[in-house]
Amino acid sequence: MFKRMAEFGPDSGGRVKGVTIVKPIVYGNVARYFGKKREEDGHTHQWTVYVKPYRNEDMSAYVKKIQFKLHESYGNPLRVVTKPPYEITETGWGEFEIIIKIFFIDPNERPVTLYHLLKLFQSDTNAMLGKKTVVSEFYDEMIFQDPTAMMQQLLTTSRQLTLGAYKHETEFAELEVKTREKLEAAKKKTSFEIAELKERLKASRETINCLKNEIRKLEEDDQTKDI
């Protein structure tokens, strides 16, 4: 049953144990060379940094805002985008690290922070000619382990972002499979470690109980001798 946000209460309905929801994302930048330095400011490129869903879905169903922290040389370096497309377009001449912070509608979910090195130049300098676009984007996954009831509802009720074809600059299908395999392997390893710890705990408790019984017997023997 669909609930309104206010109905969940200050704890967002509490944590839903045993639930894991994965939301794949793509983040990065594209850049275009002007062909020469711009006379008024010496800028050489126009670039766009972005965060977008890997699948065709509207992230605003669960994302409140995305914050992009640019280099201090830009006016108002802390940029905030509250609806799709989550992107910032600027011009410049140098590469620098951009800090991306994703905030969620549910205040009880901690923000996710990403770090992206803005790329303007091709590794092959000749590729820069002809105003060819430079692409630097990455696949990642936001994993919600034991989300709140509110967040679970938000994550499972998102709609399509566009009705047309939806694709990325980079082919991530193979990388997605590998990431899934790593995630499954990590889950199995964690389950094994938990089971192992439970066995150790059980053995420790049995040892403690044996020692307690021995101590009790010794105390009883001492009392008998005293009599």
Swiss-Prot record:
A cellular-component GO term for this protein: NuA4 histone acetyltransferase complex
Q: The cross-link Glycyl lysine isopeptide (Lys-Gly) (interchain with G-Cter in SUMO2): at which residues?
A: 37
GO biological process annotations for this chain's record? positive regulation of DNA-templated transcription; positive regulation of double-strand break repair via homologous recombination; regulation of apoptotic process; regulation of cell cycle; regulation of DNA-templated transcription; regulation of double-strand break repair
The record places domain YEATS at 15-158
Q: Which Pfam families match?
A: YEATS
Sorted alphabetically, which InterPro entries does this protein's record hold? YEAST_sf (IPR038704), YEATS (IPR005033), YEATS_dom (IPR055129)
**What's its job?**
Chromatin reader component of the NuA4 histone acetyltransferase (HAT) complex, a complex involved in transcriptional activation of select genes principally by acetylation of nucleosomal histones H4 and H2A. Specifically recognizes and binds acylated histone H3, with a preference for histone H3 diacetylated at 'Lys-18' and 'Lys-27' (H3K18ac and H3K27ac) or histone H3 diacetylated at 'Lys-14' and 'Lys-27' (H3K14ac and H3K27ac). Also able to recognize and bind crotonylated histone H3.
| The protein's assembly and partners | Component of numerous complexes with chromatin remodeling and histone acetyltransferase activity. Component of the NuA4 histone acetyltransferase complex which contains the catalytic subunit KAT5/TIP60 and the subunits EP400, TRRAP/PAF400, BRD8/SMAP, EPC1, DMAP1/DNMAP1, RUVBL1/TIP49, RUVBL2, ING3, actin, ACTL6A/BAF53A, MORF4L1/MRG15, MORF4L2/MRGX, MRGBP, YEATS4/GAS41, VPS72/YL1 and MEAF6. The NuA4 complex interacts with MYC and the adenovirus E1A protein.
Q: What is this protein's record name?
A: YEATS domain-containing protein 4
Q: What is the lineage of its organism?
A: Eukaryota, Metazoa, Chordata, Craniata, Vertebrata
Record gene name: Yeats4
